[in-house]
């Protein structure tokens, strides 16, 4: 995922966090804010120390999240800024479990409209 698809500044994070709608499942919280001036969606990813006490665990989960978003970028509306915040429940997820739970949360938030079949990969 290119850096232009990422929310980096604290001000942008705060704007989405304070003004966006939130949806959650056990593993992820999604904050969504529609933005008309976007050429493509932007995403911020947060995996705190409560999720994984070591950087290895946190970075692996962030890598999985970015991979799921890259895999599904054609299905994500271009006029959105959204945050993906991992909850401690996700600390030991493998690729498949991360994909399944993140797609469920994105579907609940109407970032992705339909769920893919389990056979699709």
From Swiss-Prot:
Top-level class of the enzyme under EC nomenclature: hydrolase
Any Pfam family matching the protein: Ribonuclease_P
GO CC field: ribonuclease P complex
GO molecular function: 3'-tRNA processing endoribonuclease activity; ribonuclease P activity; tRNA binding
Catalytic activity: Endonucleolytic cleavage of RNA, removing 5'-extranucleotides from tRNA precursor
Keyword terms of this UniProt record: Endonuclease, Hydrolase, Nuclease, RNA-binding, tRNA processing
EC number: 3.1.26.5
GO BP annotation list: tRNA 5'-leader removal
HAMAP family with a match to the protein in the record: RNase_P
Similarity comment: Belongs to the RnpA family.
Record function comment: RNaseP catalyzes the removal of the 5'-leader sequence from pre-tRNA to produce the mature 5'-terminus. It can also cleave other RNA substrates such as 4.5S RNA. The protein component plays an auxiliary but essential role in vivo by binding to the 5'-leader sequence and broadening the substrate specificity of the ribozyme.
Name listed for the protein in its UniProt record: Ribonuclease P protein component
Organism (species): Lactobacillus delbrueckii subsp. bulgaricus (strain ATCC 11842 / DSM 20081 / BCRC 10696 / JCM 1002 / NBRC 13953 / NCIMB 11778 / NCTC 12712 / WDCM 00102 / Lb 14)
């Amino acid at each position: 995922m290119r850096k232009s698809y990422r929310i980096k500044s604290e001000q942008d994070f705060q704007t989405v966090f304070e003004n966006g709608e939130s949806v959650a499942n056990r593993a992820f919280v999604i904050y969504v804010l529609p933005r008309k001036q976007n050429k493509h969606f932007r995403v911020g990813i947060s995996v705190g120390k409560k999720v994984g006490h070591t950087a290895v665990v946190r970075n692996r989960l962030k890598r999985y999240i970015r991979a799921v978003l890259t895999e599904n970028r054609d299905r994500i509306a271009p006029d959105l800024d959204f945050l993906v915040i991992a909850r401690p429940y996700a600390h030991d997820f493998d690729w498949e479990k991360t994909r399944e739970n993140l797609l469920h949360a994105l579907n609940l938030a109407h970032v992705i409209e339909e769920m893919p079949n389990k056979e699709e990969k």
